[in-house]
From Swiss-Prot:
Record membrane topology: Multi-pass membrane protein
EC annotation from Swiss-Prot or TrEMBL: 3.6.1.-
Transmembrane segments: 40-60, 82-102, 121-141, 169-189, 220-240, 241-261
Main location: endoplasmic reticulum
Region feature Disordered, mapped onto this chain: 1-21
Protein name: Acyl-coenzyme A diphosphatase FITM2
Length: 283
């Protein structure tokens, strides 16, 4: 009898209370499951889809005149002013923390690796900035005034000339598709996250911190799903209501080129590091 009591006490002392962060959250679990279905699609397929999608929508726009009086499709709408125009900001504040926390979980003993991984967003920011500057340069070079080719738009207006706008490559289309491709590439860190990090943290022991980190990663993973969905909707509006066929296509192609050069050429070649693709067998 005493032996049974002592063994019961021993068992009770070895059991640790469950971490509040490990408590199942049904709503979060549903969104994580949906996000896995969308964000784990191969980036090459995503790139091809959006190239085809923009092409088809641009063709439709060139054949059909759409009603542009709806509030949500106007440039001064809240979603355009604080969503699309601040698009790269939202990419940084959502994808950045996901990369950071995922890298911390995967590389628990390497404090420098999260910094290296986040630097990929720095490269993406440079690609976005210089691409947009290039688009502006193309617009300036292809626009002209009938009073003189070297005149600016303001100077043309002063001379009462006729201003003919040039090719305004869609910076919004570029930004949104490039952001989607970055999200798709970086989301892969969560594919085998649970199996790999569980094995790592079983050795290190700090289960409560691991659960807290996991919950944080899941929130940003779901946030990337919502950002992807928002970009999808805004791409439709941008293509159907703004720019012309060639401007939208060039914006989409530029986004795919930037993604391919960075994620499929530079990172695999050793420039910084590719997104985390570890499996249980590769720790």
């Amino acid at each position: 009898m005493s032996t049974r009591r002592s063994s019961t006490r021993a068992d009770s002392t070895t059991k640790r209370p469950a971490s509040p962060n490990s408590t199942p959250n049904a709503a979060l679990g549903i969104f994580v499951a949906i996000a896995r279905q969308i964000l784990f699609i191969d980036a090459r397929k995503v790139a091809l889809f959006y190239l085809a999608f923009v092409t088809v929508l641009s063709f439709i726009e060139s054949r059909i005149e759409l009603d542009s009086t709806y509030y949500l499709v106007q440039k001064h709408s809240v979603l355009n002013q604080y969503g699309v125009k601040m698009g790269w900001f939202w990419t940084l504040v959502i994808v950045g923390p996901f990369i950071w926390f995922s890298s911390k979980a995967h590389n628990r003993r390497d404090r420098d690796q999260p910094i290296v991984d986040v630097c990929r967003l720095g490269v993406g920011t440079a690609c976005w900035y210089f691409s947009v500057q290039f688009f502006h340069k193309v617009l300036a070079l292809t626009s002209m005034c009938d009073k003189g080719r070297t005149l600016t738009r303001a100077q043309c207006s002063e001379k009462e000339g006729v201003w003919t706008p040039g090719y305004d490559i869609s910076g919004h289309c570029f930004l949104m598709i490039y952001s989607i491709l970055i999200i798709t590439e970086e989301a892969i860190a969560y594919r085998h996250y649970q199996q790999v990090t569980d094995a790592v943290h079983q050795m290190d022991g700090d289960r409560e911190e691991h659960d807290r980190l996991t919950r944080c990663i899941q929130y940003f993973f779901v946030a990337m799903l919502f950002l992807h969905a928002f970009w999808f909707k805004q791409i439709i509006i941008s293509v159907l209501y703004y720019h012309i066929f060639i401007e939208e296509i060039l914006g989409a192609v530029a986004a795919v080129v930037c993604w391919f050069v960075t994620y499929r050429m530079l990172y695999p070649a050793g420039f910084l590091a590719s997104p985390i693709r570890r499996t249980v067998g590769r720790k």
